């Protein structure tokens, strides 16, 4: 299927099952965080998945290629970005497997219904301080800062739409780890797995991947860390099989 690209759009190869994605040329592109989250999330055959704050739709696209999940829903509040993600789904002939929904994360349980999903994935805005933003409605500001939703909104709605025993997978920043774990426990999501991500072996972690289970028992495994680069510009072996992000913008 041919898709006409709009102004400031480009087509990128995801290097997986021939999939392609439409992205903005002016910087709104998927980042390493989305790639790592799609690799960390475990989706079993027949499971239904919801991606909260899907942006370009990168996470459901990657998960549809690497897992045997039955269906992937994806929620995005920005209409233009949601429509762009929908065009990527059509481009890849995945309309029967991936559904892009334009809507607010804070309304996710109303939109989809309680206990509707086996898995929730989310790459939410990392920054909770919007000080200095020139225009809080800009695409990048919304994806990076808690302008339209908070960490608590994401966790609360994720917990509501998960079935008992369902799993949430989140990528976030280590400086908010205590807040993340506390909020998850507040909404009966028990953290079960955690993996820190370091840009280089000798650098501090700059991302954290977390799996939490709705109603799970109090026991968590801290897994071996991910090291992204072996040297500047050269990915470690772990990442050679993953799509390469064009920049570090969250999606």
Regions found by a protein language model. Give the residues of each.
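Conserved SAM/SAH cofactor-binding pocket of Class I
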Residues: 42-122, 127-133
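Class I SAM-dependent transferase core
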Residues: 2-44
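Conserved Class I SAM-dependent methyltransferase catalytic core
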Residues: 148-198, 205
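Class I S-adenosyl-L-methionine
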Residues: 190-234
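Residue-level signal for inorganic ion chemistry
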Residues: 37, 123, 154, 212
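General small-molecule cofactor/ligand-binding pocket signal
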Residues: 22, 99-101, 192-195
